[in-house]
Curated annotation (Swiss-Prot):
Keyword match NAD: yes
GO CC terms, sorted: cytoplasm
Organism: Puccinia graminis f. sp. tritici (strain CRL 75-36-700-3 / race SCCL) (Black stem rust fungus)
Signal peptide: none
Protein name as it appears in the record: ATP-dependent (S)-NAD(P)H-hydrate dehydratase 1
Top-level taxon of the source organism: Eukaryota
Amino acid sequence: MVLTTRHHLDGFRSIQVMLGALEHPLDVMKASKGRSCSENDHRMYRFSKNLPRGVCSPLTTGPHPTTHLEPTMHQPHRSLLRKAFQMIPPLDGSLHKGQAGRIGIVGGSKDYTGAPFYSGYASLRLGSDLSHVICEPSASTVIKTYSPDLMVHSYLSSPKEPEAYASHQNLFEQLLDRLHVLVVGPGLGRDTEMQDWAEWTLKTAIKKKLHLVLDADALWLLVKKPDLLRGYPNAILTPNHVEFQRLLKACSIEPRENDDDGLLAMELSKALGGCSILQKGSIDLVAREGSEVAKVSCEGSPKRCGGQGDILSGLVGTWCAWTKLYFERQSQDEKPKSHELPISSEEAWIIAAVLGSEITRTCSRLAYHKLGRSMQSSDMLGYIGEAFELVMHGHTKD
């Protein structure tokens, strides 16, 4: 089987079939034992030849010690992530525009226009079909100039203009009916009017049972009003260290000096009623009430630059959309496909958070190996496709 980069999602679907046809996923690797490296390459994948200098394809022998990708999960989570192939929309001609994910990014204000671009564009680079940015009018023209691939809506207007405000609320609510997931927070800011819009957005989205990703200043809103999300499980929060500490305090959870086991994140998930927590740090921790804590420790970049968290929110958002689409497909199928293993709702949310984190870290690493100290978040966007291939292939191995 020869698969070009253009057909890599078809390849993942094919490998998923192969995995189901064998007694155990590891038999895929055993079945290839005895063939040459080149034969195995052609049988499994043909990866892009444009990897940065010094970065080896995972199918070549003698990988570079700092770029070799290995799954970082404990065995239960590694087995779980193999199920993720089932969630990826197939590229087999059966879908029409929008059926691989319609993403909404709520953010973008007078002072912050880059963040919603990073989030929305990252979602497209991972494989969603349509990405909408809902922003403040003063930010819309600027964001439109960044990319023609984004659809930008200047709905977050001031209530000081009541007629326009009411009209924009109506248009925004109509747009929500077409989306699979809403990422709230990138470039939102803490201005009272923008925070009020975020509150209205969360309340409306929850009524419509939309999948949610909350980042940046949407978490600031949640610190002030934690009851907004309490009891709603269809959400992932992506706090950094400072944001996480604020959320703990808002939920009356006593912080601990050392928390590398994810127990505080689990407590936060329980306090908020079951949403998922992706706690960002040197090791990313993923916690959800009723599930084991997952740790993501694959190599990222030592360079910290603004926008990486926004890229993460867009990637996680795409996986959340694929989660919703997966369960919609399952409900429409009369009987499950014989090669597929069932995925529970709790498992799907863990998969979305973990793989969003792994792909972010991997594209950051690839960009850093190419550009070093000069790397910026904009450089990461071009590596999302390669990072996706590397991460997903890593989860076919023992």
